[in-house]
Amino acid sequence: MRWQWRIYEEPLQEPLTTAQGVWRSRSGIYLRLEDEQGQVGYGEIAPLPGWGSETLNADIALCQQLPGHLTPEIMATIPEALPAAQFGFATAWQSVGRLPYRVRPWPICALLGSGQAALEQWQQSWQRGQTTFKWKVGVMSPEEEQAILKALLAALPPGAKLRLDANGSWDRATANRWFAWLDRHGNGKIEYVEQPLPPDQWQALLSLAQTVTTAIALDESVVSAAEVQRWVDRGWPGFFVIKTALFGDPDSLSLLLRRGLEPQRLVFSSALEGAIARTAIFHLLETWQPCHALGFGVDRWRSAPLLTTLTAYERLWERLDQ
């Protein structure tokens, strides 16, 4: 299987502020494979080192080292330390001769902007039929965020659900105060709090989940199948947020599901990947059958429409050759 690779860097349509900082652009690698019959496939490597994946430089080094002709045996040598590369090559290989995929729309969770902007943005998403929302916390002081959140919870209609994402920014004392506040003011609208504590505080995370009433989801703590299995073995009672583009070969998640991991505990989420990776993920969802609104409501920052023709893939690829 012959293959080529091209690096991309795209500015975000507007900066995305999280507890880890401000994102202004997104970089990655597009892959193009072609077999002896001339059938093509495409993949995307979109690492996010702040979320536990490798760096883009590590993926560039891999692409420079691999031979110009791929085989399954060669791809099997891609190390687990490069999960975004594993995903990109695996999905590219699987797509050869099968594009375009038929993909369906799934319910999407709308990501709201930080601060006061959330009080206006939810209405636009609600009018588009979205009923699940996500808001980043840990960006301002707890008092400022709780004042905004109280107004947001009062404004959200019946049936709306809200996810709070701390991106691991709280310490245990802050988390305790937040969960006590949510017990008083949550109005039954909080679906879960995502990654309240840093990933290295696993014992505190487990203790917290066992003592609070609001559900907790792990995100940065579970960037690989091995980490999900580790948390299952620890008795984790909450959700797992799966950033599929950073998770490695998709077969690793399929194996966990076959071993008994309950699909209703999984929430699939974007890593601000591009259209090639997003379309591959939505194709995989036909097998995984998600039970919750997808965390892909990020078009305000990076628009990545699903690719429905082979020409659409070719245009993306050729754009990087200009």
Curated annotation (Swiss-Prot):
Name a single GO biological process: phylloquinone biosynthetic process
EC no.? 4.2.1.113
The molecular function GO annotations come to:
magnesium ion binding; O-succinylbenzoate synthase activity
Sorted alphabetically, which keywords does the UniProt record give? Lyase, Magnesium, Metal-binding
UniProt-listed Pfam families: MenC_N (PF21508), MR_MLE_C (PF13378)
Cofactor(s) needed, names only, are: a divalent metal cation
Q: Which CDD domains match?
A: OSBS (cd03320)
Keyword field contains Magnesium = yes
Active site, renumbered: 136, 243
Q: Which domain of life is it from?
A: Bacteria
**Ligand binding (Mg(2+)):** 165, 194, 219
Judged by the first EC level, this protein's enzyme class is: lyase
Task: Say yes or no: keyword Magnesium present.
Answer: yes
Which reaction equations make up its catalytic activity?
(1R,6R)-6-hydroxy-2-succinyl-cyclohexa-2,4-diene-1-carboxylate = 2-succinylbenzoate + H2O
Q: In which pathway does it act?
A: Quinol/quinone metabolism; 1,4-dihydroxy-2-naphthoate biosynthesis; 1,4-dihydroxy-2-naphthoate from chorismate: step 4/7; Cofactor biosynthesis; phylloquinone biosynthesis
NCBIfam families according to UniProt: menC_gam_Gplu (TIGR01927), PRK02714.1 (NF002739)
The record's similarity note reads: Belongs to the mandelate racemase/muconate lactonizing enzyme family. MenC type 1 subfamily.
Subunit: Monomer.
Q: What does this protein do?
A: Converts 2-succinyl-6-hydroxy-2,4-cyclohexadiene-1-carboxylate (SHCHC) to 2-succinylbenzoate (OSB). Does not show N-succinylamino acid racemase (NSAR) activity with N-succinyl-L-phenylglycine as substrate.
Protein name (database record):
o-succinylbenzoate synthase
Organism, as annotated: Thermosynechococcus vestitus (strain NIES-2133 / IAM M-273 / BP-1)
What is the primary gene name for this protein?
menC
